[in-house]
Amino acid sequence: MELDFIHTICPYCGTGCGVDLVVKDGTLVGTNPFKRHPVNEGKTCIKGSYCHEFVHRDDRLKTPLIRKNGELVEASWDEALELISGKLQNYSPEEVGFFSSARCTNEDNYVFQKFARTVIKTNNVDHCARLUHSATVVGLGQAFGSGAMTNSISDIEDADCIFIIGSNTFEQHPLIARRVVRAKEKGTKIIVIDPRYTPTAKQADLYLQLLPGTNIAVLNAIMHVLVKENLVDEEFIKNRTKGYEELKTTLETYTPEYASKLSGVAPELIVEAAKMYGSANAASILYCMGITQFTTGVNNVKSCCNLAMITGNIGKPGTGVNPLRGQNNVQGACDMGALPNVFPGYQAVPANHEKYAEAWNTCVDPNVGLSIPDMLAKAGEQVKCIYVMGENPMVSDPDIHHVEHALKSLDLLIVQDIFLTETAQVADVVLPGASWAEKDGTFSNTERRIQKINKAVDSPGEAIADWKIVKMLAEKMGQGELFNFNTAEEVFQEIAKVTPQYAGVTYERLGVDGLHWPCKTCEDPGTPILHCEKCLTPDGLGNIFAIDYADPDEMADSEYPMTLTTGRIIFHYHTGTMTRRSKHMADEINEGFVEIHPEDAEKMGIKNKQKVKVSTRRGEVVVNAKITPNIKQGVVFMPFHFAETAANILTNPAQDPNCKIPEYKVCAAKVEKI
């Protein structure tokens, strides 16, 4: 039996593990961890071990589909592109929106946003970072001048204290959690702050179980203790930051006792957390969507930055503020400018439109475009057409009834994907893309490591790489000269020309290990740790912000007495499009549930595995109860992977005004037995 082994990168979370796809007679038959990969070091999690299983599913999209007489029917590429081209040319730029994709390559995202900006002349381009880590991009950007992980994954092992807040690392980033375990074995102290007693919390030396939405109260109280106990780094504050005195004044109110009343965390635990973090020579903060998906998401992130800066935990090994990105290329999609306010490399639209007009040899709109929530809010009125590439907002976005109404209000909905997702099912035109295993390109992982992916097998039927589809559409619209690429490598060469952080990167230089951006010249070895000498702000100083606690948009009340929070489980990934088509994942669990504390369940007369109705002001879902002491009393938890019991029917679309991220992590709910 002759087997081929094709080195590539896992398509799931943002860790960026190296894997070898096993190919026999043109078919994927297995996945092996890549033994020498610097990120995962020859290990994979359960999702990564079976990441090939969805690729050859029979229900892959193989031809374009066009809606005729209410039904989606097969069509030729020429017919589908002719229809789209004709429609697009009749819309004004502000009437068209683009949802780009954290699932797709850097090359796909670059070409997609370039099409929006050069052919359609709109900055209405966004992607799911809006829903997960837009608070990171804004918060870290304002604090340090760069909205990305400050340190590397391997660097976590150099910490004396690891402070994990709003991240279930052991289930959602298992190969990063492996680093946490190794650090703990060497004596590193672990602090975990989370409303759920997760597998991550079980590894903690100190666990703080807070009420959802009270992160700032707890963080401010920890900093209050640090100031009081003189555990701050006065030298670092003086030489590397500004804004400390204002923060210090704000912190006076946040005694551990005051924060305890807001958060439910015992005052003595807050004091112990402060002393544990503050006494470490090097302390690393890890966080995820448990602090970003709030109406205060940006301020939550900036509070973590405050904590790191006042203790001098920036710019050296084992320190930093380190967001763990949820998707394989959500970092790269942001880097590529798949956002309404920035071009590639986070270059602001108003200030840099002339630069990109020159680079692309065409005029571009100088105005900031619409975000995903704004496009959906204006659908059917200002926005007539939305083009979705590799996203599934009918399951992933909050208040799904509103999303469905918005998408059905459009004159034209184009969906480009590998399966007929819930979103594709309501589309007017569906275009079949290639999966990650069927194309060349690059992903950029959570630690800013740019890595090469390699084609292992052919796409099914007439499916085509996403960037090539966009190029074909541009050619159909008479704009092919703007997309004079024949290979993914040629796309990347243009990326390097217009993206300062990628300027020194080539496919050849990436090799197997990849490179950390910024990598600005061909001699630059890359930058695993940011902000070593100074921050990337205009004056080189880190910005400390005085931040007060604010309640979530929706609090539990007499009508909806429980607090609902949502998230993921280890066996599934986002909207389940891939993992629910993986036999090994589906065999583990393939239906939704709601976690309820035993005392709450007893009061409501609910038994384990009993059907219950969970309702909020936006809708209701019938789902199985899972009685567990791991959830805080008064709080219920639902995973959002399962379309038939969609948690996002219930979630609150209220947004952080600074980044427009929705408040997935907290809303008022009630649970009733059926």
UniProtKB/Swiss-Prot annotation:
Can you list the disulfide-bonded cysteine pairs? none
| Cofactor(s) needed by this chain | [4Fe-4S] cluster; Mo-bis(molybdopterin guanine dinucleotide); Zn(2+)
The 4Fe-4S Mo/W bis-MGD-type domain sits at 3-59
Report residues binding [4Fe-4S] cluster.
C10, C13, C17, C45
Catalytically driven reaction(s)? oxidized coenzyme F420-(gamma-L-Glu)(n) + formate + 2 H(+) = reduced coenzyme F420-(gamma-L-Glu)(n) + CO2
Gene Ontology cellular-component annotations: membrane
Alphabetical list of CDD domains matching this protein: MopB_CT_Formate-Dh_H (cd02790), MopB_Formate-Dh-H (cd02753)
Q: What is its EC number?
A: 1.17.98.3
Superkingdom, according to UniProt? Archaea
Q: What broad class of enzyme is this?
A: oxidoreductase
Biological process per Gene Ontology, one example term: formate metabolic process
Q: Which InterPro entries match?
A: Asp_de-COase-like_dom_sf, CT_Formate-Dh_H, Formate_Dh-H_N, Formate_DH_asu, MoPterin_dinucl-bd_dom, Mopterin_OxRdtase, Mopterin_OxRdtase_4Fe-4S_dom, Mopterin_OxRdtase_prok_CS
Pfam families registered for this protein in UniProt = Molybdop_Fe4S4 (PF04879), Molybdopterin (PF00384), Molydop_binding (PF01568)
Question: What terms describe the molecular function in GO for this protein?
Answer: 4 iron, 4 sulfur cluster binding; formate dehydrogenase (coenzyme F420) activity; formate dehydrogenase (NAD+) activity; metal ion binding; molybdopterin cofactor binding; NADH dehydrogenase activity
Q: How is the cofactor bound?
A: Binds 1 [4Fe-4S] cluster.
**What are the protein's UniProt keywords?**
4Fe-4S, Iron, Iron-sulfur, Metal-binding, Molybdenum, Oxidoreductase, Selenocysteine, Zinc
Knocked-out gene: effects: The deletion mutant cannot grow with formate and produces H(2) poorly. The fdhA1-fdhA2 double mutant is unable to utilize formate for either growth or H(2) production.
Note in the entry: The genome of M.maripaludis harbors two sets of genes encoding the F420-dependent formate dehydrogenase (Fdh), fdhA1-fdhB1 (Fdh1 isozyme) and fdhA2-fdhB2 (Fdh2 isozyme). The Fdh1 isozyme is the primary Fdh and the Fdh2 isozyme may not play a major role.
* Family affiliation: Belongs to the prokaryotic molybdopterin-containing oxidoreductase family.
The entry's function note states: Catalyzes the oxidation of formate to carbon dioxide, with coenzyme F420 as the electron acceptor. In vitro can also use methyl viologen as electron acceptor.
Known partners and oligomeric status = Dimer of an alpha (FdhA1) and a beta (FdhB1) subunit.
Q: What is this protein's name?
A: F420-dependent formate dehydrogenase 1 subunit alpha
- The organism encoding this protein is Methanococcus maripaludis (strain DSM 14266 / JCM 13030 / NBRC 101832 / S2 / LL)
- Report which gene this protein is encoded by: fdhA1
